Amino acid sequence: LVGSEMCIRDRGRTTPRQRIDALLDKGSFVEMGRLAKMPGNPDNPYGDGVVTGHGTIDGRPVVVYAHDNTVFGGSVGEAFGKKVCAAMDLAIKIGCPVIGINDSGGARVQDAVTSLAMYSEIGRRQYPLSGLSPQISIMLGKCAGGAVYAPVTTDFVVATKDSYMFVTGPDVIRSVTGEDITIEELGSAEKQMEYGNVNYVAEDEYEAFAYVRRLLSFLPTSANDPAPLGRTGLEPEVTDSDLS
């Protein structure tokens, strides 16, 4: 992944691990499947375009995955999908939130049906998490296809103002329907919020991460856990009337 990180740095962007570190408590991230790769070609990159693992936010457990847009455009392949599924299986087992940092072009064309099958497996794991633990999607960059229709089925979607979400792009729509539509009209974050697919639009990814941290501070880790307690500061926890 060194080449990937150099490529991201040259583009002036943050790496998936930097994004995860900005979201989670400092030093809490434990990576899963770092050496996973697609067999058959020794040049296939380790990690397969996604970073997965678990950590904490305000001391509470979360599972997180982040797309690496410099590896096959962040598209979903077999090893990629298996890594995300393993992370989600952990969230189901322990009952904790799942946070996806999405920056992907969707399915990996060269993997054909296998890529689509991985989306099916990811979606199958969203079902037992629904109503059990919060599922949150953070949208960064230009996201298309499965990198959009999977996130919109999660509980909360947070997007940066320069991100885009569409099932297919303007060129395909133009060739199929003859309709001219701009990328802004089709899938800008503001438009997606108007459509009801995005809950909050952040100025940048760091505001998005801060928003998600604050959002989780209001939510229980799972349906089996009590909601977090907040101290309003309006009155002491124990008053004279309580003692009388």
Regions found by a protein language model. Name each.
Residues 19-136:
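Long, structured ligand/cofactor-binding scaffold of large enzymes
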Residues 8, 91, 192-193:
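Generic structural signal for hydrophobic
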Residues 223-244:
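Long, low-complexity segments enriched in small/aliphatic residues
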Residues 1-8:
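Short, small-residue-biased leader/transition segments that mark boundaries at the very start
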Residues 13, 60, 96, 156, ...:
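Short glycine/serine/threonine/alanine-rich loop segments
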Residues 14, 29, 221-225:
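Intrinsically disordered or highly flexible coil/loop and linker segments, enriched in small
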